[in-house]
Amino acid sequence: MNMSKQPVSNVRAIQANINIPMGAFRPGAGQPPRRKECTPEVEEGVPPTSDEEKKPIPGAKKLPGPAVNLSEIQNIKSELKYVPKAEQ
């Protein structure tokens, strides 16, 4: 029961991580990428060979938002699960 003995300031610091946009947790859950909507003509006019050159990794998906370490997010989520609601 170590989590219940933490000071309230620690609980608040952990709760600050809740405000991360859902796009960081689940790709596609956040706002849709605007590049496809704003520039459909450019994507159609570009030949497929240059598209393959743009992708450094063959199977990599472009995700909306900044690149985030999944391991860090999973650690944060596991911390959030065990914060008792009584101390909020």
Swiss-Prot record:
Keyword NAD: no
Disease: Deafness, X-linked, 4: A non-syndromic form of sensorineural, progressive hearing loss with postlingual onset. In affected males, the auditory impairment affects initially high-frequency hearing. It later evolves to become severe to profound and affects all frequencies. Carrier females manifest moderate hearing impairment in the high frequencies.
Reported effect, S78N: In MPD7; uncertain significance
Swiss-Prot/TrEMBL keywords: Deafness, Non-syndromic deafness
Tissue specificity note: Preferentially and abundantly expressed in heart and skeletal muscle.
Short name of any one Pfam family annotated for the protein: Chisel
Region ranges (Disordered): 22-66
The keyword Nucleotidyltransferase is annotated on this UniProt entry: no
Gene Ontology cellular-component terms listed: costamere; M band; muscle tendon junction; nucleus
Entry-linked InterPro entries: Chisel
Protein name (database record): Small muscular protein
Task performed by this protein: Plays a role in the regulatory network through which muscle cells coordinate their structural and functional states during growth, adaptation, and repair.
Family: Belongs to the SMPX family.
PANTHER family: SMALL MUSCULAR PROTEIN
GO biological process: striated muscle contraction
